[in-house]
């Protein structure tokens, strides 16, 4: 049986990257929450 997690940096960046987050209002909300929480890394 094939495992569910098949890592790919391109897919990772496209779905969870900074520019993808900035592209939508909800994505910007995510970044704002992570900044407020004090995350050292905001996005993938």
Curated annotation (Swiss-Prot):
Region described as Disordered: 1-44
Question: InterPro entries this protein is in?
Answer: Ribosomal_bL34, Ribosomal_bL34_CS
Q: Indicate yes or no for the key word Ribosomal protein.
A: yes
Please indicate which superkingdom the organism of origin belongs to.
Answer: Bacteria
Its keywords, alphabetically, are:
Ribonucleoprotein, Ribosomal protein
List all Basic residues biased stretches: 10-19
In terms of Pfam families, this protein maps to: Ribosomal_L34
Coiled-coil region(s): none
Q: Which GO terms describe its molecular function?
A: structural constituent of ribosome
Q: Identify the GO cellular component terms for this protein.
A: ribonucleoprotein complex; ribosome
Biological process terms in GO annotation: translation
Q: Which family does it belong to?
A: Belongs to the bacterial ribosomal protein bL34 family.
The protein in question is named: Large ribosomal subunit protein bL34
**Source organism per UniProt:** Psychromonas ingrahamii (strain DSM 17664 / CCUG 51855 / 37)
Give the gene symbol: rpmH
């Amino acid at each position: 049986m094939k495992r569910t997690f098949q890592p790919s940096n391109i897919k990772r960046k496209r779905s969870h990257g900074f520019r993808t987050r900035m592209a939508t209002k909800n994505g910007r909300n995510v970044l704002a929450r992570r900044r407020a929480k004090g995350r050292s890394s905001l996005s993938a």
